[in-house]
């Protein structure tokens, strides 16, 4: 089964996660098919903490990819950020 999940990177005590599309049988930080975004939980100041390529994510979902619990929570958060960033008319 194809799954969209987070792969951990970064240094010790300084996590950085890549949002990847991978086969569920592969290791968390192992081989993946495509990188569709990132999540930086320790972003400070003007650093970007979350970026998702929504077009690629919807493509993989249409192909049957399942989102992990954490990724689905981050997608909802990203949607709220995008909605807040759009100018009100």
Swiss-Prot record:
Gene Ontology cellular-component annotations: cytoplasm; small ribosomal subunit
Pfam families in alphabetical order: Ribosomal_S16 (PF00886)
Gene Ontology MF terms: structural constituent of ribosome
Alphabetically ordered keywords of this record: Ribonucleoprotein, Ribosomal protein
GO terms under biological process: translation
InterPro entries membership: Ribosomal_bS16, Ribosomal_bS16_CS, Ribosomal_bS16_dom_sf
PROSITE patterns xrefs: RIBOSOMAL_S16
NCBIfam families: S16 (TIGR00002)
Family: Belongs to the bacterial ribosomal protein bS16 family.
The protein, known as: Small ribosomal subunit protein bS16
